[in-house]
Every structure is written in structure tokens, then in C-alpha cells.
Amino acid sequence: MTEYLSVSALTKYIKYKFDQDPHLQSVLIKGELSNFKKHSSGHLYFNVKDKESVISGMMFKGNASKLGFEPKEGDEVLIEARVSVYERRGNYQIYVNKMQLDGIGNLYQKLELLKKKLKKEGYFDQSNKKLIPKYPKKIAVLTASTGAAIRDIHSTINNRYPLVEQIQISTLVQGTQARQDIIEKIQYADSLDVDTIIVGRGGGSIEDLWNFNEEDVVKTIFNCQTPIISAVGHETDFTLSDFVADVRAATPTQAAVIATPDQYELLQQIKQYEYTLSRYIKQYIEHQKKQLNHISSYYKFKQPSLLYDQQIQKRDELERQLNHLLNTKVEKSKHHLKLLQQSFNFKNLNQQITQEKQSIYQLHSRLSKIMSNNITNLKTVLKNKLESLNNLSPTNTMLRGYAIVNKDNEVVTSTHKLNENDQISLTMKDGSVDATVKKVRCNDE
């Protein structure tokens, strides 16, 4: 009699075979996660697929808690698992013990975790950024000794600002020894008393650029006292060195542009300053000319004697006062002498007279000396003021060969006020001349 198996019996037998096969107890699988779900219990459910096949999988909470990343839909992963059968559905599936991102994905995960850590510690804060000097004298360039990056940086700096001194510091930018070499070269550049440091290299994969994501490289850049421009990779490439540097440049060429001013723009600025200064000086001179012409038109300068007439009168008044004081003093002395003659006996009269004469003589000498000194000082002051007035006098100016130009009874102070065939009058030291303007020449033409 033929014996039939139940579905559950067959399923259990197949599961038994799977579980007894040592090749299925620990398999290494590479694939892409799909239909990923995290159950409220903490277990993970998903499919692992490649271009041709799909297999169901799950990971218990205990193993899932040990993962160093958060799995998600589309992740390329490397899995260590055992293969067995889920009896209830009769499906075979994998029970995952370990899981990690495959290759580049793992690097991106590591990069993201380190970025979050450094950001939390304040390494990327804008408040820590240093300003790039506008007019550097020395720039240190850290990059490979050959390649497009160094050529682009040097040629751009030479074209924009040839005055700056470039210090080339060759460094490894890729490979296992590059990390330590980059750190040492940055520290060396920081000791050279340069104004700016450019750290750069050409583009590449995340593996090629990884040395610029190393934590100790990032911290070396952060601790550098010299402003640093990071120019690692192309515009779409980002490294942690870009975030910690004072300025990030999309390319090595842009780094050179950021580090230097444009010599042609500077020349244009200098010309603008020169024009502004020249215009200001001309305006100032014109203003001073107008002030001088305005002052020279004062009535007192046309008749200089009015300036010192009062001084002469004041001097005469002082002289009169001094003479009056002197005469008064003499009269008082005479009166005093007379009283003395009356008060003393005849025997002492000659002696008293002699003493009074000496006193009067000394007093007279002192008064005469005071009066003479005052008169001399007044004459000196008057002479100095007369000389100052004569120097300002239009007449004295004409004595040195200058002439005053008048048109329609007004003084002409600029060639801009004259036209050809205008009738003018030239006033000189000994008379005046009528003339006709034949040609006008202006200094600013």
C-alpha cells in the first residue's frame, strides 16, 4: 500500500536536512536589502537580492542591537547567516547573525558617524573660522608634487597676484602613509609664518580622499593657527577637512582665487583713488582761491592805511600819557622838596637837597627808560604790522610784476570767465592798460 506524507511532515524533513547540512549553518552572502521592516519587537525582516534571485531573511533583536549602523532599503550589505526552513509557510530563508555595509557603503556610514561626532564637539562651528587675509605676502601650498592640482593653483596665483610668495610643500595625498604625512606637513606649514595655507588635491573616489576624513587630520587643521583653505577633490566631493577648514573651495583653482586678490581689480581701485584724490585737491585749491579773492576785495585791503591809523593814534595817546605821568611825578617831587626845605633846618638843607636831587634824577631816568622802551616796542609792533599789511597789499603784489585783470569793473580770477574778443583792463603798479582777449588757455585742457 502506497504511503503519503503530510505537508508538515515533508516540511519538517526538508528543514531537518537543511539544519544538518554543515555548509548551510554558516554562509556568507552579498546582496541588496529590499522590503526592509523593523518590527516593534526589535526583530528585522527583509529580503536579500541580486540581479537574478531573492531570498527572505530575518535578524533577531539580540543580533540587530549589535549593528554599527541603521540598515535601510537599498543598502548593499555583507551577511553571515544560517539557512533553514520556516515551517509554517514552507519557505527557506536565512537567519542573519552578522551584517555590515559592503565596501563604499561602509565608508559612507563611518564618515557620517564621525561627522556627527565632530560637529557635536564644535569642530565645524562658524565661530572658530579664521578670516582669509586679503593681501597675503606668503602662501603655503600643500598638495602632491605632480598633477593638475598644483599646476592649477600656481598658474592661477601667478595670474592674479604675482606679488605673493608661494611655498610649495609636497605631501602624500593617497595611500596608507598619507595620513601621517598630511598631519606633519600641515604642522610644518603652520610654523613658517605664512599668511594662508592651501590644502588641495584632485578628485577621486571616497577611498582616494579618505585620508582627509581621518579624525586626527581634521583636528590638526582645527588646531592650526594659520587660516586654511581646503580644496580636496572636485566640486561634488566633500570631506571632513572641508567642514573644519576656515574656507572650503570647490576646486584647487577656486582655492587660489579665494586666497588672492585680482591684480587688475587692484589697479582699477588705485586709479579710482587717484582720480578721487586729484579731484579733491583741485576743489580745495579752487576754494582757497575764492577765499583769497574774497579777502583781497575787503575795503581795508584796498586802503591799507586804514589798518594802522588807529595803531598810530594809540601810540600817540600812550606817549601823551607817559609825558603827563612824568611831569606829574616831577611836580610832586618838587613839592615834596619844598616841604622838606621848610621842615629841616638850614644846617641839613644842602644834604637834603643833594639826596632829593639824586632821587629825582634816578626817578627821571627810570621814567625816561620806561617811556623809551614802550615807544620802541610800539614802533616795532607797528613796523611788523605794516610789513604784514604791505605783503598782503595788492599794490605790493603789483610791484613784483603782477597785474589785476578786470572785466566790466569786476576782478577776473579764472580763465573760465574770459572769452575771445572780451575787453579787459590790466591794472599795474603805475597805471592801467586796456586790452582785448585773443585766445584763452586753461590749465586743465
Curated annotation (Swiss-Prot):
It is an enzyme of class 3 (hydrolase). It comes from the Bacteria. GO terms for cellular component: cytoplasm; exodeoxyribonuclease VII complex. The keyword Membrane does not apply. GO terms for molecular function: exodeoxyribonuclease VII activity; nucleic acid binding. Keywords: Cytoplasm, Exonuclease, Hydrolase, Nuclease. Its EC number is 3.1.11.6. Its main location: cytoplasm. It holds the Pfam family Exonuc_VII_L. GO terms for biological process: DNA catabolic process. It catalyses: Exonucleolytic cleavage in either 5'- to 3'- or 3'- to 5'-direction to yield nucleoside 5'-phosphates. It is found in: Cytoplasm. InterPro entries: Exonuc_VII_L, Exonuc_VII_lsu_C, OB-fold_nuc-bd_dom. Heterooligomer composed of large and small subunits. Belongs to the XseA family. Bidirectionally degrades single-stranded DNA into large acid-insoluble oligonucleotides, which are then degraded further into small acid-soluble oligonucleotides. PANTHER family: EXODEOXYRIBONUCLEASE 7 LARGE SUBUNIT. This is Exodeoxyribonuclease 7 large subunit. It comes from Staphylococcus epidermidis (strain ATCC 35984 / DSM 28319 / BCRC 17069 / CCUG 31568 / BM 3577 / RP62A). The gene is xseA.
